[in-house]
């Protein structure tokens, strides 16, 4: 069964090889004949490609080596945020990353929790996208620097503190946990809006903090302090 799945994925990789080369030729030709302005292409239509291969490390590495020769604007690792175990995702990143161009964007698709992001950065990833901060917020799950809280829980009914005392977002500066919980319990749409605003602010601040820690050479300590804490439910 393993061999059969591997063989099928191998055929997918071969097909993607041909598509990668064709798409690159089409994009370059569009610039050459003036259909697309070169400056616009570079600024707004940057080409990224994705290293495929399911959970087969050898296929992912093989495909990454192939697309690395295409000199694209960035390279993505995808297909690891749709139910795969976290340990498998980290292993695939670790296997593929050494073969990704050092001077190009490294993009992990569809990831993830704050802990996932910190672990992926530790493995060389630059860029992420995910619905998690907004989707979780709409269900009352809010990120803080001490972990994740469920604002619907009864213990927040009379809690006058902000969602996160360490957060400087407009929501934390203006509203209490008790009020936001009330909005959720009353099914007021404002509750979800405030929750989404907070979580998006938190994620943006997390990325800023990661960049600062990398610049300061203190990212390893930051990783050790927060990689598990931020995903803990409190």
Which residues does each predicted region cover?
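Membrane-targeting and insertion segments and their boundary/processing signals
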Residues: 11-18, 94, 146, 150, ...
């Amino acid at each position: 069964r393993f061999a059969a799945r591997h063989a099928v994925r191998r055929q997918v990789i071969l097909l993607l090889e041909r598509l990668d080369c064709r798409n690159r030729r089409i994009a370059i030709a569009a610039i050459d004949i003036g259909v697309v302005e070169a400056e616009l292409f570079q600024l707004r239509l940057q080409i990224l490609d994705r290293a495929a291969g399911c959970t087969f490390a050898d296929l992912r590495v093989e495909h990454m080596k192939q697309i690395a020769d295409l000199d694209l604007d960035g390279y993505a690792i995808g297909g690891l945020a749709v139910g795969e175990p976290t340990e498998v995702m980290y292993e695939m990143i670790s296997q593929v990353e050494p073969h990704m161009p050092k001077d190009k964007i490294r993009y992990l698709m569809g990831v993830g929790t704050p802990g996932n992001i910190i672990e992926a950065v530790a493995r060389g990833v630059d860029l992420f996208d995910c619905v998690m901060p907004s989707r979780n917020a709409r269900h009352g799950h809010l990120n803080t620097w001490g972990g994740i809280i469920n604002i619907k829980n009864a213990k927040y009914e009379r809690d006058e503190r902000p969602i996160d005392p360490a957060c400087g977002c407009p929501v934390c500066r203006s509203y209490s946990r008790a009020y936001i919980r009330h909005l959720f319990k009353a099914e007021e749409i404002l509750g979800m809006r405030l929750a989404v605003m907070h979580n998006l602010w938190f994620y943006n601040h997390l990325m800023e903090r990661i960049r600062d820690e990398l610049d300061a050479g203190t990212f390893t300590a930051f990783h050790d302090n927060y990689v598990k804490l931020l995903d803990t439910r409190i």
